[in-house]
Structures are given as C-alpha cells and as structure tokens.
C-alpha cells in the first residue's frame, strides 16, 4: 500500500491544525520576492489539495501533482466546490515530474520532500523542477529538520476525529537518517464497528548542506534558508526549514 492510501479520506480531519491559510499567506509573501511576476504555480506533492485550492482561489493558475491517487481523489472533490478556475491535478511522483509548459513558481509544503529517501530521487526531482521553471522563477519548499526527526525516535502520537482514530509510532535510524512512521488508522463504519488500516511512512533527514548541494547541481543559483514562517535564519532547534531557490534568467 502506498503512503497515504488509507489515510487519504481522513487526512484533512486529522491534520486540521495544518495552518494552511497562514502558509498560503506566507507563500504569497515569498512570491513577491520573485524576479518575474507570479501567475502560474505548481504545487508539487499537493496531498489533498488544500494549498493548491487556496492559491487558485487567490487567482493563480495552479497545477498540482501527487503520487497518491487516493489523495488526489480528495483534492478533486475539494476543488469542485471552488468558485472560478480550479487547479489542474496530475497523478505524478515527484521524480517523474513532467508538465506541458514551464511555470513561474514551484511550491512544496509540509515536508513532502522528506519522503524522498534516496539521493537519486531527490536529485532527479530538483533537476525536473529546474527544467519546468521559467527563467527567473523560484522553487519554495519546506522540510522537517534533522533535529525534529531525530527527536521523534521512540515517540507515539494520537489524532482523532468523530469517526476516526489514528496512532503514529515513530522510529529514527541514525545509520540511514530515516524516520519511520508506523500508522494504525481506525475508522467507524456504517455498522457501528471499527475498521483498521495500517500504513508505514518514511522521511529522510536531509542536512542543509546536502540540500544546497543538490539544488546547485540542478542549476539553481541563489538559495536562501529560513526558519518556519519567518525571514530569520533557522535556529539550532528549528523543526522546519523553508528553502527558496531561484533559477537564473
């Protein structure tokens, strides 16, 4: 089973504290730093499409890709309620990104890039993002920091809604720098009993130096890194980093 196949229908309820509007506001603030006007946006690994839909509502022409068909099903349903032009959703894994024409900006939020656990995949993803960015465009993404993922070793977390209950168990390997999430999801069915699903998620802890190297190899010239939703450099105990990489004109 692919990551988020079972969780897709419950994801929005379980992740209700994702601060999506605040993140969309922050993305727009970074759009204003672009050397070219931002009209078209690619949301890479869009999940259930919340950020993509918020940006579409604000007038951007949005393409959104994800590797999970189940997550995209939720995204398409969400977009159907929008006024105006909805995002164009495409079923694509990040290292297989392919568009019809370049876009002004590429975004990827909520640690999607951490799910690329192999160097070959993250390098290919950065190369393809660079390929499909217009000259002068920017690539904005966030990652969970090594500090955060290392601290998650041996932890257990629980989320619940009215009709679902989720237990996350996390384990971090210092050898592979991979944090494994074992997820048990219980959902209330029509008969008043609970159905159980299990998924395993894996996130790689990439260092700032590694990500800067991969971006430079892909062709990006200017890279800035800040803490989460701030213009300041990351603290040593920062949980999330935001990268902004620019393509030369």
Each predicted region: which residue ranges?
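A short glycine-rich, Lys/Arg-flanked "PGG" loop and its adjoining helix->strand segment in the class I
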Residues: 123-135
């Amino acid at each position: 089973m692919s990551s988020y196949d079972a969780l897709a229908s419950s994801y929005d309820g379980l992740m209700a504290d994702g601060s999506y509007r605040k993140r969309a506001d922050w993305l727009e603030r970074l759009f204003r730093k672009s050397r070219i006007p931002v009209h078209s946006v690619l949301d890479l690994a869009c999940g259930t499409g919340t950020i993509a839909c918020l940006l579409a509502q604000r007038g951007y022409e949005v393409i959104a890709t994800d590797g999970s068909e189940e997550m995209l099903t939720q995204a398409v349903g969400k977009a159907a309620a929008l006024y105006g032009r909805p995002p164009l959703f495409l079923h694509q894994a990040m290292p297989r990104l392919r568009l019809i024409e370049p876009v002004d900006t590429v975004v990827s939020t909520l640690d999607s890039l951490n799910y690329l656990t192999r160097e070959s995949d993250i390098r290919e993803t950065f190369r393809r993002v660079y390929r499909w960015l217009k000259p002068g465009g920017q690539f904005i993404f966030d990652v969970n920091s090594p500090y955060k993922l290392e601290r998650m070793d041996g932890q257990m977390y629980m989320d619940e809604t009215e009709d679902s209950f989720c237990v996350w168990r996390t384990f971090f390997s210092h050898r592979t720098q991979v944090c494994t999430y074992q997820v048990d999801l219980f959902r209330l069915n029509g008969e008043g009993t609970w159905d159980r699903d299990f998924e395993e998620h894996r996130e790689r802890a990439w260092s700032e130096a590694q990500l800067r190297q991969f971006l430079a190899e892909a062709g990006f010239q200017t890279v800035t890194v800040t803490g989460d939703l701030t213009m300041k450099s990351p603290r040593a105990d920062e949980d999330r980093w935001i990268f902004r990489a620019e393509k030369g004109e």
